[in-house]
Regions:
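Extracytoplasmic
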Residues: 58, 68, 117-119, 128, ...
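Short, low-complexity N-terminal intrinsically disordered segments enriched in polar/charged residues
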Residues: 22-69
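Short beta-strand edge/turn micro-motifs at domain boundaries
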Residues: 24, 132, 146-175
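Bacterial N-terminal signal peptides
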Residues: 9-20
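A mature extracytoplasmic/lumenal domain signature
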Residues: 67-69, 77-79, 135-139, 168
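A short gly/proline-enriched turn/hairpin at secondary-structure junctions
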Residues: 73-94
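Surface-exposed, charged secondary-structure patches
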Residues: 87-144
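Bacterial N-terminal signal peptides that target proteins for export
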Residues: 1-11
């Protein structure tokens, strides 16, 4: 005969409840639409399109205009494997690199190379005042993947439009 302790008996007693309890799952877009923020979501998607177009056009001025002017947080965080490779090349390599959107806009404006970022698996959350956007990316230079990872933007809605306040991304350059 099988003997069960009190913990096992409690777990068995709760099993039917656990198996029948269902939590509704909604996508970010469904949640936002239900909360009345569909127009904000569309405006944020427009910021992403403008970002992409500015990079393709080497337009650092337009790119800079998408960011909150006083915001400077731009973090590039190497993945563990990328950091290990970087340390082999330079023992003083940094895992977290701090920069700002102005430096990126300057690079976009001055490089003769062709930049083309690809974004996928977009997840967006907003309350109509602040927002976070999370996506996977591949950053192509002259048609070749130069970097990949995940990226998050924190955005704020000012009196006139949505602006990126900070950018944080993981970085896995090709080997």
């Amino acid at each position: 005969m099988l003997k069960l302790n009190n913990l096992a008996l409690c777990a068995l007693a709760l099993l039917p409840i656990a198996l029948t309890a269902q939590t509704p799952v909604t996508s970010a877009a469904q949640t936002q639409t239900a909360n009345g923020h569909r127009a904000d979501e569309a405006a944020i998607e427009q910021v992403m399109k403008q970002y992409h177009a500015a990079i393709l056009a080497h337009d650092g001025t337009t790119l800079s205009g998408l960011f909150l002017p006083d915001a400077n947080l731009w973090l590039n965080v190497l993945t563990d494997s990328a950091y290990a490779r970087a340390q082999v090349k330079s023992p003083t390599a940094r895992k977290v690199r701090v920069s700002n959107y102005q430096d990126f806009a300057k690079l976009v404006s001055t490089t003769p190379k062709s930049f083309d970022p690809e974004h996928s698996n977009l997840v967006m959350h907003t309350d109509g005042t602040i927002a976070v956007v999370y996506f996977d990316f591949v950053f192509n230079i002259d048609g070749k993947a130069n970097n990949r990872g995940s990226e998050t933007w924190q955005l704020v809605k000012t009196t006139d439009s949505w602006h990126v306040a900070s950018t944080i991304y993981s970085s896995e350059p090709p080997v």
